[in-house]
């Protein structure tokens, strides 16, 4: 069978790679075309566009890049038409993917969606498009099944969270060998995860790095995004006690004592590695003001959303400043606070289900094509 997969972000590349691996194991004649990244490319040939050329975040940033976005939509439609896949698999990235899904459904292609758009947070009206244009939906958060089936009468498959697979499949990291390899000393590590896009990394790192002199007994390591080169981070490395590791986020989290994390998938990854964290976000002021009007959520981090309570502190916009960050980081370095936080992480993992999300999704997709 021929599979066309569209992932527009780093997290989608990770989950897309594991999904491709699963499909290949079940369909020996599988061939692929995809929009994604390096991890998907390691699994198969057929990269059309890399996600680093697709990722625009925030209302204002999208407006400034509309011409590029529409050009990419046109390229995608033409490539799908030329490839004639048996199924198109969309991975999150709703602004782009739902446009393609509407077109693809009219053209007679099978449309499957892995990792639901977060319409339970905002743009719930998109449910009409999803019901009309998506043949099968595979959800990864426990409350999403109830949202779709009970509230909107749209059957979906809850497959568990693929991050559990990704973490379970990785090779274990030896802490001493890791430190030696990357020129680190024996002090506990505080990981800095500033995001994957240039615009957010610059904003986040400026404040994250402002606190390092207050924590001399720790060493700070920036998790460099796979979509960025070392040269991009160079201006941020002019202080002592700051290190950079490119494309080694899981290895870094596995040996970290605490983390400061930009809101997004990384908050859940950090929790699954059982690393106490402070969640932060600072975006374009206009974009954030608009988002606050339309997003109907109590929290921004997946950890708090899934557990439906504030487990990790969230510092957003003006609250994300040097003084608050020092205060909140000090809290999670306290032994008693850490014990309580780690217990909540255990409850989180139980809610997400066990391993096998990628495998289950691959099986459902292959079976649907028989």
What is the predicted role of each segment?
Residues 1-370:
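Nucleotide-activated sugar donor-binding and catalytic core shared by glycosyltransferases
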